[in-house]
Every structure is written in structure tokens, then in C-alpha cells.
Amino acid sequence: GTLEWVPKNEIDSLNLWEGDRIFHRLLDEEAPFFSLKLRYQDDLLKEAVLDGKPLELLDLLDENGEPSGQVRERTLVHLNGDWHRTSHVWVVRRRGDGGHDLLLQKRSREKDSFGGCYDISSAGHIPAGQYYLESALRELKEELGIAAEPEDLRLVGVHDGRYEGGFHGRIFKNHEKSHVFVYEKPVEIEKLKLQKEEV
């Protein structure tokens, strides 16, 4: 091995362990004292815990939209604009006149992006090692309290989403491949259990 001085602004362009990228981001943000625990399996980051709270790890995608074998923490994915996966579920209600209504959620103002905006009925990032459908079912349960079965969701398309901007004084680059599902079973809005952090 060797030792060399590297300008701070060039560190992120180097071949680093993913845990080092998280550590460097925290230093850049001038985070106060923190506890960061990392667990690797071979060379792959499997778990990252900051101050006792698990961080979201996402699979990065290759040029074909498939998991590349590389995993990265969510805030770094959005800082770098890395391609990743999400699931979107639209809850649809048929009206008597043949039209349709969509159930929208108004995002919490505390969200890291698009706070206070209306959004898809239920959506979320797909954790590393998981799949679109299982993630869609989990998000529907967590965000709205709807316990759906796999056959209750109908895949209606795949969407490549791109956005580059900023929120809360931070760079935000979103490059995502989303599987879009529709849920059409009857829903009584007053019986839904909303996830405070999301809605």
C-alpha cells in the first residue's frame, strides 16, 4: 500500500468503502459527535447504523436497470444521482359514473424531498436485496395500513424518473426505476392508519 495526500473535494471520486462514504458525508455536514456502526459481508456493506438507527441501503443499478452488486446509503444515492429502485402504488376507486378517483397523500413537511406536496398513494425505496412487489406491499401496509396480497396489486408500467435540484440547502439528484402498481379494492379512508413520518 501507499500513503498520499488527497484534496478533500476529490475524496468522493475515489474507490472507497461505502462506509467511508457515509463517514465522509457526516464530516462534510459537520455532524456533532455520532456513533456509526458498519457491518460488511465480504466487500459488501450489509448494515449501517447511525446513533442506533438503521440507515437505508439501496441496490445501485447497472446500465440494464438491474442490481449491480453495489449497495449505497440513501442520502449518498441522492447526493450522487445513482440509479436505484422504487415501488409506486396508486390506490384507485371506481365511481358510479364510470370515472375514477385516486387516493393521494400529502407528504409530511419533514420529508427530505418535496415536503408538503401531494404524491402517489404509497411509494418507497426498495431496500438492498429486496424486490419491487414485496416492497410495494410493505410500503402500502406501513404508510396506509392496507394489508394487501400480491394478487391485489396490478403492475401497470415501469417508469424511469429523473430529477435534479435541491431541498433544505442540500443537493438532491433522483434517478430511479419504478415499478408502478394499481390497487383497486375498496378502501375506507377513515379506517386507514397513516404513518406519521410519511403523511
Language-model regions, residue ranges each:
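Unchanged
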Residues: 1-26, 124-199
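Residues embedded in well-ordered beta-strands
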Residues: 4, 58-59, 88-90, 101-103, ...
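Charged phosphate-binding loop/patch that engages nucleotide di/tri-phosphates or the phosphate backbone
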Residues: 27-55
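A short, sequence-level motif marking secondary-structure junctions
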Residues: 42, 74-76, 198
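Acidic, metal-coordinating catalytic segment for phosphate/diphosphate chemistry
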Residues: 54-97
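A glycine-rich, hydrophobic loop/mini-helix early in the fold
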Residues: 86-126
